[in-house]
Amino acid sequence: LTAVGQSLNILGSLISAVCILSYCGRITKFYLAPDRSLNENERLADGFEQTTELIETPTSVNWKYEFSYQGKTHIGYINELAVYRASFVIGMPGTGKSHSFLDPAMKQLIAKHFSAVVYDYKDPTLSNAVYQYYVAYKREHPASTLRFGYLSYVNINHTYRCNPMKGISTSAEAVNFAITILTALNKNFVEKQGEFFTESAKSYTAIVIYALGVLFGGRYLSLPHTLTMLSQVPSVLFPVLKLISVLYPDMKTLFSPFKEAYDTNTLPQLQGQLASAQIGLGSMSDASLAYVMTEDEESRDIAVDLDTISSKESPMLLCLGSNPRLGAVLGLANAVYLTRIANLLNRKGRNPTAFFADEVVTTYINGLDNLIATARSNKIAVFLGFQDFSQMVRDYGQKISDAIVNTVNNVFVGAVKGKTAKELAESFGKKTVKKISKSITEDGKVTTSIAEHKEERITQSMIEELSQGEFVGRIADEYGKEIKCKVFHGKVIVETPEKEQRLREELENRTKNECERDGRSYLPDETPWIPKVRNWSDEEIKRRLRLNVIKINNEVSDVLLKLNEIADTYKILTHLTTGTDEFCLRHYLAEPQNPQKRINLFVWLEEAYRIVWRMGELELKDDILSFEEKFQLLLRDVYTTSYEGLQQILKAREQYHAMDLNSVKQLIDEYEDEYGTNLVNP
């Protein structure tokens, strides 16, 4: 029995030891063995479902990219089907905004028969690419009427010429350009609209633009002429502007803020009101800007008509160059170009057009928010590039910046930091993630459970840590072309077909040969591939640009000389109307029955008729008023004392048959014969 008991005891001990070892093994395996559920959690949380199907339409833009999802790398496609709902590409310098997104978009839309406007901040980088796509398109479609245009302030031998202000004819357009010019000069202007001095500067600039638009058929209306005119002393300009406003009611409205100061001859006050319209104008005097933004008879064949960019009959690809070294000067010039283009494009029934503005905050596009809001109905694909939301707020103001950002439907994001990254991460929403967890029971069994929870689809840290060429974003779809997976995160694949590479090498080699013949160095990032339209030496360029500036200054001077002659007569008429001298009009109105006082009326009428007659020399645009209608407007402008006096003047004209200049001169001669010439010496 003792032996049996010992045996049983030993057996029990062995069984207990085995059980203990088995239990310990399970615990060790649970805590120390590689955790498959953790690996599975990482796999399940890796990325999110994205589009792997290429969806092309006649107006789509498509990018190939690779992305990670559940531990595997996939090839996907960013299918931008709603190109008319605007796009922005945001990212710090070096993220690949242009190379990854803007350049492929330009290539594809040009191939799909779009017109295009391209703001090339680092001229001629994008311009060379557009020209390459233009050449490729023309080879594929030799009968096409598509044209190419290039405006550059640094490559004068290659540049076309274009006056963006040509054709402005309404006060609304003049005000719009005034805002554009002043905001380009001072980005804080947009936030100060409504303030007294800001509104005065805006009205004054608008009046000058309007006046140049109506004088001499508008042929002196350009940005260089406007800047030259604005640099004049206000006391010289105001009599001229006041006189012209007599015949144009909408211009008269613009003049109203200055009327009291002008009527009371408090011109120093006017100078204070207009200081912000003149600050910085000296630095805007640039000869290359003046050359590109004006036209002459010799340049008609290379003059760009902005109104024809989106023409169905002869659409155009227009590249607008800039240069970081001339930021302020060219920012103003390009602001005027892009604002005008945006207004002209935004109409129905035109050719589909792409509007590319990389580094858009380096200029100011007045009405950009409206262009984006209405682009879909007018078939305009807007693509904007910038570095950070704070830039937009700084240069466009909070309200306009919010309107731009919140109405753009297609968003492409490279690496950005801080608040911008946080806001964008939140905008991409959350994703559902399955999480596997396991536990061990008291009896040693391991149980596994699966739960779902929400995580940010794209986190702030993901955006901040994106590598070059990596982007996140969201695209919009169209009715009937719905896209399930709108958000993407991956590395864009930019492929260059062999045919495209051969064309690139052909254009580059041709340019290198031209540089060699001309004794110039070929600089890959600075030399345009675009053919020359003139072949001037550096000295000849300087001479031509200088002569053009002199021509502009002389034209403005001649305009002012002609206007001042008439304005001097206008001053005399105003004095004869309100003054108390011997020959002033009030003496006649006080004693209309006194024969010797009639000369006051006749002298006044002679000066008024002379003004109306001489205004015909100004070749006023849309001059549809008769001599009598102009006289009536002039009369009501200078005589504001009483309605009775006004009627008295009109009746006296008829009574004495003094209805034109010749009849009044005859009446004055008769008066001199009767009373002696010594009485008539006003």
Locate the predicted segments by residue.
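N-terminal accessory nucleic-acid engagement/regulatory domains that precede
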Residues: 1-49
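P-loop NTPase motor domains
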Residues: 32-38, 70, 74, 78-380, ...
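N-terminal pre-Walker A segment at the start of P-loop NTPase domains
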Residues: 47-76
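Conserved ATP-driven motor cores of ASCE-family P-loop NTPases powering translocation/secretion/packaging/pilus
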Residues: 372-374, 378-476
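Conserved P-loop NTPase motor module
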Residues: 439, 443-566, 573, 619-623, ...
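Carbohydrate-binding surface patches
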Residues: 473-476, 585, 599-601
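Repeat-associated, polar segments at repeat-unit boundaries in modular proteins
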Residues: 591-624, 657-680
